[in-house]
Amino acid sequence: SFETITTPDPGQNFADQNLRFFPRSVTLPPNEAQVVKVQLLKTSELAPGEYRSHFYFRSVPKAKPLGEKETVKDSTSISVTLTPIFGITIPAIIRIGESNTFVSLSGLKLEVSDDGTPAFGLTFNRNGNFSVYGDLTVDHVSPQGKVTRVGMANGISVYTPNADRHFQFNLNKTAGVDYKSGKLLVAFSSSSDVKPAKLADGELVLQ
C-alpha cells in the first residue's frame, strides 16, 4: 500500500511547488512520441540544498460511454475483469548551491550459489548535501593480469537523506573466469555518454 506524504522528513525537500510541466495529458497513436516541457519556478527563493519530486506518467483506460451496458454471457457464474494500468515515475531534482557530496564503497563480497551463479554485493556510502547517481562496473582480473568485464548495473542512486544503500546483483558466468582466484575491480561512475567521472572504486581479492 502507498502512503501520501505531506510533510518532508528531516533533510528532505520537495520540488513540486517549483516545477510546472505541459501538456498534462496527451493521446498517442502507436509508435508515436510526445515532448513534455518542464519549467522551473521561483528558484531564486530556494535555500541551498536539494529538492526532489517525481513525475508520474500513466496510461488512462478508455472509458465506456455512459449508459452502455455490458453483454452478459453467463449469468450463472462470477467473472472478474482486470484492467492493467501501466505507469512510470521519473525523478525531478533541483539543486541549489555547491555540492560537497562524495561516495565510497564498502562491504564488497562475492557469493557463488550451488548452480554456480556469482552474486556480488556491496554498500554505497553517501556523504554530503546532494544525492548521487551513476553506473556500476565490475571487472575480473586474473592472476596473469587478464581483465574481463563480468558485470554492469546502470542507474544506481542514493537519494538524500539516505546515508547508504545495500546493493546486490548477479555477475556473468563467463567462460575462462575463475571466481576463486584473481580479484574484482569495482568502479562507480557518473552516467554520461561523453566522459563519465569516477565517483568511487574498490577492490575485492578472490580466494
For the regions a protein language model found, what residue spans apply to each?
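Exposed aromatic-hydrophobic patches
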Residues: 37, 163-174
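A short beta-turn/strand-edge loop motif at beta-sheet boundaries
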Residues: 128-133, 176-178
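Short proline/glycine- and polar residue-rich coil/turn motifs
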Residues: 26-33, 155-165, 194-196
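Low-complexity, acidic Ser/Thr/Pro/Gly-rich terminal tails and inter-domain linkers that flank the onset
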Residues: 96-113
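Terminal connector regions
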Residues: 41-94, 175-207
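Short edge beta-strand/loop segments characteristic of extracellular beta-sandwich folds
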Residues: 119-127, 170
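Surface-exposed binding patches on compact interaction domains or structured appendages
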Residues: 1-38, 144
